[in-house]
Amino acid sequence: MEKREELYRGKAKSVYKTDDANRLILLFRNDTSAFDGKRIEQLDRKGMVNNKFNAFIMQKLEAAGIPTQFDKLLGDNECLVKKLDMIPVECVVRNYAAGSLVKRLGVEEGLKLNPYTFELFLKDDAKGDPFINESHVVAFGWGTAEQLARMKELSLKVNDVLSKLFDDAGLLLVDFKLEFGVFHDGSIVLGDEFSPDGCRLWDKDTKKKMDKDRFRQGLGDVIEAYEEVANRLGVPL
C-alpha cells in the first residue's frame, strides 16, 4: 500500500490518500486538544496508544457484527482504513451524567441514566459542535432518516458491547461519541476512532477519571491513565 499526499489534518489525526481509491491511512499524532481546539499540547506516546487502542476496540466491534472503517495496523502510529463519505454528525450515548449534559441540565455528575440517552451534535468546531435533533439532520441534508436510524441502531449496539467490555475491566463507560460515514457500496460504517479521547471512562470503585477529562480539567497523568485503561483491557502496546 503506497502512502500518498495528506488529504486532511484534524486536531489529533492526519488522513492520507493511498494508491487504492477506497482506502486511506490514518496517522495518530501526539497532539492533544480541548475546548474545540483552543488548547493544544503535545503528549508523548499518545498517538501510539490511541492508534493501538482504536485498533483493539474496532476489532472487538467487528467481531460483534458492527461494520467499522478499520482494516489493519500499519505501525505504531498508523492504520489502514476504508474511505468513507463522512456524515457531519456526532452520535453521543450517555450512561451517566457528565460533561455538557451536566452543564445544560444542571444535574449531578455521575447520575446513572436509566435508560441511557442518545444525542446528536453537528460536527462544526467554529460553531462549537451545537446540539441538534434528527429533524435538523434531515432538513439540512446532513443525512437521511434511514441513515440516522442505522446510526442510532449501531450506536446502541456499540454501547452494549463496550459497556460489558469496560465493566469486565473494572471501568464505567460514562459516555462516548461516534462518527459514521457511507462506504462506496452505500452502507453505513463506523468511522473515525474510539479511544479515551472520545469517551469518558471512570474506575468503578474510585470513580477516578481515566480519559481526556484529565487533560481538560488539568488533572495530570493523562497518558498514564490511557495506558492503564489499555492494560486493563489487554491492548498490546
UniProtKB/Swiss-Prot annotation:
List UniProt keywords, sorted A-Z: ATP-binding, Ligase, Nucleotide-binding, Purine biosynthesis
SUPFAM superfamilies on file? SAICAR synthase-like
Q: Which residues cross the membrane?
A: none
Question: Biological process GO annotation list?
Answer: 'de novo' IMP biosynthetic process; cobalamin biosynthetic process
Keyword Ligase found: yes
Write out the GO MF terms.
Answer: ATP binding; phosphoribosylaminoimidazolesuccinocarboxamide synthase activity
Q: Which is a Gene Ontology cellular component entry for this protein?
A: cytosol
What the entry lists under PANTHER family is as follows: MULTIFUNCTIONAL PROTEIN ADE2, SI:DKEY-6E2.2
State what protein this is by name. Phosphoribosylaminoimidazole-succinocarboxamide synthase
**Gene giving rise to this polypeptide:** purC
